[in-house]
Amino acid sequence: ESIVKMQNWDKRADKESEAAGMYLLTYHYIFDKLNLGTEAFIEGMDVDNNLFIEAVAYANDHLMEYFETLDVTLGELQVHVRGDKEYGVNGFADVLAANYNMPYTNGKFKTFVADSYVQFAQWKDGELSIESLHPYGASNREWSEHYNDQMELYVNQETKKMTLDKEEIYANAEKIYHPK
């Protein structure tokens, strides 16, 4: 069943994909077993059928142990975590908007390397439009409301509007101060 699921997979690392979740566990097993690093994504690798079957069996066992089903999406298995927030997230190490993950808790993996600050600027008809995003939030202070307030936007691949217009910034500022 799991092999058929991966054979029919569209090869997209979407958080809603069960096949992507199965693939994540399978490639983690193979990379660990062969002591491979990220260069294997570039150089390629040979995996014999026996190792692949062994890796799929490992993935099945992992899903049954931690989730009690083989029908687990990538977003249930791979999460983006900061503070008390945890969201399922798209991506693998070798895709656009790539991320790397590591074992986390309860059979899950958490991202630890991914996109950083993202900004899109567009000039149209003499007008500037800016959208931005940080994978977590605009603060490293755990007590700040901005510590992890952009995570949901990030996992949904959305951005927020921003401006460089000083008057608009002052008009909408939560607080105006001068750093010491």
Give short role names for the model-derived ranges.
Residues 1-180:
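Acidic, low-complexity N-terminal propeptides/linkers enriched in Ser/Thr/Asp/Gly that mediate export
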